[in-house]
Amino acid sequence: MIEVARLYRVDNISSVKAFVDVVIGQVLVKGIRIVEGKNGLFAGMPKSQGKDGKWYDTVRILDDELKQELQDRILEAYNV
């Protein structure tokens, strides 16, 4: 089960529109970004910057069905 625990909208000119925390089962994932991309809105997983200056995902959803469900729930909550 996926639950949107918190959604914080960002009012600026950045492509990041909001930050979201979600609960997946007994796991809380903080810092998911809702981003306006070339093809519309999408959910970007939390990232951290490595010592090499590159950004790396800190959470990766391996199951495509779960990933799509997560994206759908997040965007549904954002569009309410």
Where are these regions (language model features)?
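Single-stranded nucleic acid-binding surfaces, predominantly the OB-fold ssDNA-binding core
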Residues: 1-80
